[in-house]
Amino acid sequence: MAHYFVGDIQGCFEELQLLLNNVDFNPSKDQLWAVGDLVARGPGSLETLRYFRQLEGSGRVVLGNHDLHLLAVNAKIKRANPNDKLGPLLTAPDIGSLIDWLRMQPLYQELPEHNLVMTHAGVPPQWSLETLREEADHVAAALRSDDYLTSLICHMYTNGSNCWHDSMSELERKIYCINALTRMRFLHSDGRLDFDCKLPPSACEDPDLSPWFEHSGLLNSTHTLVFGHWAAVMGKVPSSTIHALDTGCCWGEHLTLWHLESNQKITQNKLKKS
């Protein structure tokens, strides 16, 4: 079995299909892992969700911030970003079943035989694998509940839960988990999440900020970590066991596919017409 990991698709469905054709992806024997943000800026968000849903066991997905935002937009809790191309998805006849499928997806995935963990934005340095499992599973349970919109989604738009500590309420822990696993980029020197700076690490001039993956972490010392989210990084991280797969396809750059077994990365430039 070949394991392929793809960066943020964001509705760039044609580029995804070109990549998969390039490597002769066969869902009967291969697996496709996606780092989240399946939807948003590209024109093929509907096709992307339908594709991963029909992959069933041959596809492994984690939720990204744009995927969670879609849940809020579909429920009219938030308005769609005018730069997103979600119209065909939001008006599709199967939008209800697609939303239900999406909210059943987790915030992390594991490949134990390779000591590999995948999330959308990364893993907080102070979290062990056990903490990641426990906190992310609590969020997943909330998303799968019938009242997920009122109990979780309508509360998640806050920057307040930016520092992990033992005295957090249950809801604060869930919001911190969402913020860390789907929005994290830079951390302050005391470990607080920073939500303002989205620059490439080399362009950040604030001495108190550094990328989360440059902090000494409990997981990145023992596991291979796969993440997306931060297109400005363009795949450049100072570790051979951390793979940054968002290479900005929806921003005019390219989509990246990583083949685990050969440790090769294959790219597809964004198509001009999309």
UniProtKB/Swiss-Prot annotation:
It holds the Pfam family Metallophos. Its EC number is 3.6.1.41. GO terms for molecular function: bis(5'-nucleosyl)-tetraphosphatase (symmetrical) activity. It comes from the Bacteria. It catalyses: P(1),P(4)-bis(5'-adenosyl) tetraphosphate + H2O = 2 ADP + 2 H(+). The keyword Membrane does not apply. Gene3D superfamilies: 3.60.21.10. Keywords: Hydrolase. InterPro entries: ApaH (IPR004617), Calcineurin-like_PHP_ApaH (IPR004843), Metallo-depent_PP-like (IPR029052). It is an enzyme of class 3 (hydrolase). NCBIfam families: apaH, PRK00166.1. Belongs to the Ap4A hydrolase family. HAMAP family: ApaH. Hydrolyzes diadenosine 5',5'''-P1,P4-tetraphosphate to yield ADP. This is Bis(5'-nucleosyl)-tetraphosphatase, symmetrical. It comes from Shewanella sediminis (strain HAW-EB3).
